[in-house]
Every structure is written in C-alpha cells, then in structure tokens.
C-alpha cells in the first residue's frame, strides 16, 4: 500500500468535514450547548453524516474496511457502563419531565444518530484508522486522532462560544481517547457509533427538557474522566 496518498485522503476527508461544519455553525449561529441546538442543527448534521459516508466510500473504502459486528467479549463488558449510564439518564428524563414533545424527541434522535455516524467515520476512521494504516503506532494514532477530534470542536467559536470552549476541548479530547481505544480493542465501528449516539442524545434531551444540567455534569464528567484514565493507562502501556 502506498501510504502517502491514503494519509492525504484521510486529511482531505477531515478537512472537508470540518469546513462544512464551520459553515453550518456560521450560518446558524447557535452554540452546541444551547438547548435549541439539536432542533436547529439536525438538517445540517444529517448532511454531515451523508458527507462523511460519501467521503469514506469515495476516498477510503478500498483501503479501510468497516466492521459493524459487536463481539461480546471482556472489552465490551468493561465499557458497557459508558452506554448504560446515559441510557439511565434518558429514562430518568422520560419519566420525570412534563415538557416532552414527540417531534423534538424525533429530531434529537435523528441528530444524535447523525452525529455518531458523521464524527466516528471522520475521526475514528479517517483519523485513527488512516493514521494506523499509514505507519503510526496504535498509541500515536489514538492520541493524534483524539487531538483532531478535540480541535474540531473549535468550530463552535464560529457560533459565538467563548472561553468556556476550553473545558469542551478538554472533555472532547478525553472522550476521543476513550472512543479510539474502545475502537482499537473491539474493532467495531458500530459500537463506538452507539456510544457516541447515546452520549449526545442524553446531552440534547437533558438540556432541552429539564433543569438537570448539574445532574448531567455530575454524572457524565466523572465517567468521562474515569474512562479516560483507564484508556490512557492502557494506551501508554502499548508497545506498538
């Protein structure tokens, strides 16, 4: 395999995806943390998901195959809480909120699915997998793809987000390490899409339908930090 063209195609995929996201942010002018974000953003996010699929299919498909099966092995069960905890948050909201609207729920669901597909294909496939296929070590590929994933969220500046973006960059870097490590261990793009989808769906619904933002932060931040520490310890032990 000629590695340079593949690396170039991976970078082109990430660049085009990021450009489209920034243009969408500039047009909408609504921040990611805004309760109305998902409702306004979902047509753009579906477009981004289609773009990510098209970029993989046209540029990367021949060199980077995708595995959609999920193996119920040790690594799956170790990481299962990262799926179940946002699910419990969603159940809590569904049973306690009196302001749920079916139309908004459908939009949040569609947006979250699209986010999971778009960002995992871009940063775990065009990022991590391409880096791995072009000679990077697993450790380097995980950390660099997580950094790219974090820096991508600078696009929120286009929507007017201020210094609070620093904390978002830190959280997204940690989550990027966790997702890339889980992808390395499971080799299942479907599983990391599901994790990404569940976290975004819980974020959108909790912020839109409740005043439980503090509960969301109290639950989600320790989980992300805990799994980041677990993933980083294992990443740093890797010899390849």
Region roles according to the model:
Residues 60-66, 230-240:
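Membrane-interface capping segments at transmembrane-helix boundaries
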Residues 121-144, 184-188:
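Membrane-interface helix/loop boundary segments of multi-pass membrane proteins
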Residues 6-58, 83, 106-107, 111, ...:
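Alpha-helical transmembrane segments in multi-pass membrane proteins
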Residues 1-15, 75-78, 137:
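N-terminal membrane topogenic signal
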Residues 44-48, 171, 214-234:
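Small-residue-rich transmembrane alpha-helices that serve as helix-helix interface/gating elements
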Residues 92-106, 156-163, 207-214:
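Membrane-interface helix caps and helix-loop-helix hairpins in membrane proteins
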Residues 17-26, 85-93, 146-155, 197-206:
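Aromatic-anchored segments of alpha-helical transmembrane domains
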Residues 166-221:
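Functionally important transmembrane alpha-helices
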